[in-house]
Structures are given as C-alpha cells and as structure tokens.
C-alpha cells in the first residue's frame, strides 16, 4: 500500500467532512506563493514546456490538468507527470496533477477505466460502482495523477438535460445519484486518488453545456434542492475532499455564475463542506461573459473558490498570475482568504500529491 493510499483510506474512515485538525502555526508565506498555489493550468503538449517547468519551480502554479491532447501512452504520461513533480520538488511546493476520467465519452486515458458511462454504472449497484472507482484510481495513481475531476453529481431530472443526453449522470433520482456518487468517490479514495464532485450546485436542470453557452438556471431554491442531495450525502460520508463549482448562473442564488458567487460558496460551506473548491474551466466562462481570463479568475477568487482551473495554453495564464498577485498586493484579495485557501490546498496535497 502506498503512502497516498494509506492516507486516503484513513480519510475515508475518519470522515474528512467532519473537519480536520488545524495545521500548526507557521510564518506567513509570501503573497506570490499564496497566489501561485491557486492556479491549475493546462499542459501544451505531451511533454512539459520549459516555461511551465520554470513556473512550477517558481511556485507560480499549484496544479496541472491533463487533457486528451497530452496523452499518447502510459509510459509517456508517467514521464510527463514525473517531470512535473520533479520541478515542484525542487521548489518545495506541492503540485496537484488532475484529469477528467468520468467514464464513457469523458475519459482522457482511453485505455483506463471506467469504460462505462455514469449512466451505465448507475445500473450496477453501489458495491460494483465502488470497485469501478477503485480500479480507476489504481490506474490513475500509476500514471502519477492525484485528482480525478469526477464523479458528476448532477441529477438530470428534466427533459432535455444535457447531462442526460451525454450519459454523464448516474440517475434522475436524487437519492440514487447520491448513493452512486458516494460509492464512486469512496472507490477513488480507496486507491489514493481524490475525487472532485461536480458541478455544484447542480447542472441537472440545464439543457445546454456551460462549455458552449452562458447558462442561467431559472428555478427556485425548492426546485434546486434535489440537486444538493448527492453533495449532502458525500460530505456526510467523508468522501468529498474537492467540489467543482458550476459556471452556470442561478436566479435563486443571485443570478451570477456560481463560480463568481459568494452566496453559492456559502451554501456549499453550509452543507458542512470543509474541503477544497475548484472552478470549472474558466476559459468558457470568460468567453461567454465577455471578460478576460484574469477578470474571470479574480471574480472567482474573490467569491472564495480555492483553485482556479484553466485548460487552454499554459502561456495564457501567466498574465492571470500577474493580475491575481496585483490584486493581492493591493489588498483586494485578502491575506486571510489567501491563507485559508492555501491551508486547504496544502492539506489536500499532503494527502494525495505525489
């Protein structure tokens, strides 16, 4: 059993959602490091560019995401993640390596499980779903991946749901989705990989993907409540170390994109969630709302999202880092908020990274 699996197994049985012990006091880190820890960036090719490795060594990047374009073979991926980790080790900074391995059509490593979609997995029962989660995490851990941006916790309960059309939801029944999401998440943790439940507070009522359009879910809080059921259960079970925040806007929660909404973040924390939050890819949000990448990131950071996710060219995020650092130095991003996010990210990395 690897150290990561042992730690992750302890998390499952201890119940992470009940809250973790506070970290010992230490000297305040510089703003540059606090800002860098929050950026998750894409990799431009099947190898890491010199500029990306340099940014990791300088502490300007806290994580990377691997997409299909970064994948040629298992040995190649392992060499890539090893080089990324080596750069982080030189700097003494944690680095989270992420991917999307939901199953079905959303699978960056085509040879790795789960081959079945969430919809197909939903017919297998909780024990089998947990096994599939464990198989997935075992494969990802061998590749050097720490975080799976899965499972989808959305409840596709309306006609025309894009989640249902893409077979990405476990069930239209909230309690069934809750059980299946909890089982798959527990399976990922069994193998030492952190799950990231998505897309809070739910995309089950959306008929279009936020990757393609600005989406507003015009529903009351009572209509949205069933979409919170999977999160409540997974948080209570201690199998939700990470939650991804939706790019959709919700009229019930103020009408701005959830990733920019302090109200949505407060709703999640009110469910007892003490882990790390991450945005969905910020490029589509910036495009559909006609703002720069830096503006999209700043708004999410101000709302309280911990990790800011970018899947496009790595070089495009250098200006984002500079803009965030300028906001921090001007006091428009509070040090207290930056330190709180950094503490959550460091705890996550201590358990799963490497």
Language-model-derived ranges and their functions:
Residues 37-43, 62-66, 95-101, 147-151, ...:
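Hydrophobic faces of well-ordered beta-strands that scaffold small-molecule active sites
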Residues 155-164:
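Short, conserved phosphate-binding/catalytic loop or strand-edge motifs used
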Residues 113-125, 168-171:
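A charged helix-plus-loop insertion that forms the helical arch/lid used to bind
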Residues 31, 51, 72-85, 89, ...:
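Second-shell residues forming the walls of enzyme active-site clefts
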Residues 2-24:
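Secretory targeting and sorting signals
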Residues 85-114, 129-156, 177-202:
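Glycine-rich, aromatic-flanked loop segments that form ligand/cofactor-binding clefts
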Residues 23-58, 107, 288-354:
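Preference for extracellular/luminal or secreted protein segments
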Residues 23-111:
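N-terminal hydrophobic targeting/anchoring segments and the immediately downstream early-domain regions
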